[in-house]
Amino acid sequence: MNLFELSQNIGKINQNKVISDSIKNVNDELNGLTKDRMCKVYSSYVYNELKKNHILARLINTNDLGFDYEHQFILVQINKLTKDYYLIDLTYSQFIKNIEDEKVFTELLNKGYQKINNELWIQYLKNILRNNNVNSSIDEAFNKEINNNRINL
């Protein structure tokens, strides 16, 4: 466990509340802008809010994962052992044809974030990339070496 993780545990930071408050602050600041196709703007704002609140988050771009389609979102690690993460994507609704039919990512659609594991990660990537040949681990995406918050492959 690194020093940052220790400091989070000592401070008993409620990641769920910080993420929710960060999304609310971003929505207030960007009031009037459409979320569709604004993934970079929204993700960057939420990422900066999370950083201000000392939450270890990764700004992920699908291009950096080796995919042709570009989309940006955030991962926040909840627990290394269980490999659970929060996925934050305020623009996910653009990938859903019929919101009433969406059963898996209802929290993501309603709250802007959702707790996921590797199985849900694969499903999420398949939904946004419209590709069934997705072979990517959520741990690999989160733990890639980064410079200036960008992933280095």
Locate predicted features:
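A structural boundary/capping signal
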Residues: 1-153
